[in-house]
Design a protein with these regions (language model features):
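Short helix-loop "hinge" at the ATP-lid/N-box region of the Bergerat-fold HATPase_c
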Residues: 45-49
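Glycine-rich ATP-lid/hinge loop adjacent to the conserved G-boxes
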Residues: 50-51, 93-103
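Acidic ATP/Mg2+-coordinating residue in the GHKL
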Residues: 75
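Conserved micro-motifs of the catalytic ATP-binding
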Residues: 22, 26-29
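Short conserved segment of the HATPase_c
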Residues: 80-92, 152
Length: 157
């Protein structure tokens, strides 16, 4: 994937395994912004790697049902404090981890959330401090087509 290539040097330098599975799903979205969002999430995974663990990984996978496709990015980094989780998408919020790692601006996940909102998708995050962080981007199916069909039925377009 383009995201793995873009982050190749950082992944190698930090000895992080990058795995992609079941990611052959087709979603209708803006490819440039999608790549930007994934880069933000992967950069966070790299930045917040748990240096005490012998093996570090970032796993990207997708799952599909009738209503949506969910892209999941999972890492086994340092995790996020439960008290910080509700605010990770807030502008300029860096939380405890951001204070410990001076590279944090608090803008990455904020921008990811704003882009998801604009593109009609949803982003969510779950984490356990010291264990993992899981980011999910949900792409809803047929919203665009449903809108057009509804408009056609009412005689307007």
């Amino acid at each position: 994937s383009a995201v793995a290539l873009k982050n190749k040097d950082d992944l190698l330098e930090n000895n992080i395994t990058f795995e992609v599975s079941n990611a052959d799903k087709l979603v209708l979205t803006d490819a440039k912004w999608m790549e930007f969002m994934l880069n933000q999430i992967v950069n966070n995974s790299i930045k917040y790697k748990d240096k005490t663990k012998t093996e570090s990984y970032i796993k990207m996978s997708a799952a599909e049902d009738k209503k949506c496709i969910v892209l999941e990015i999972l890492d086994n980094g340092i995790g996020i404090n439960a008290s910080d989780l509700p605010r990770v998408f807030d502008k300029s919020f860096t939380g405890e981890n951001g204070h410990e790692y001076s590279k944090a601006t608090g803008m990455g996940l904020y921008i990811v959330k704003k882009l998801c909102d604009k593109l009609g998708s949803k982003v969510s995050i779950e984490s356990v401090k010291g264990e993992y962080t899981r980011v999910k981007i949900t792409f809803y199916k047929n919203d665009f087509y449903k809108e057009i069909t509804d408009s056609n039925e009412s005689g307007s377009m």
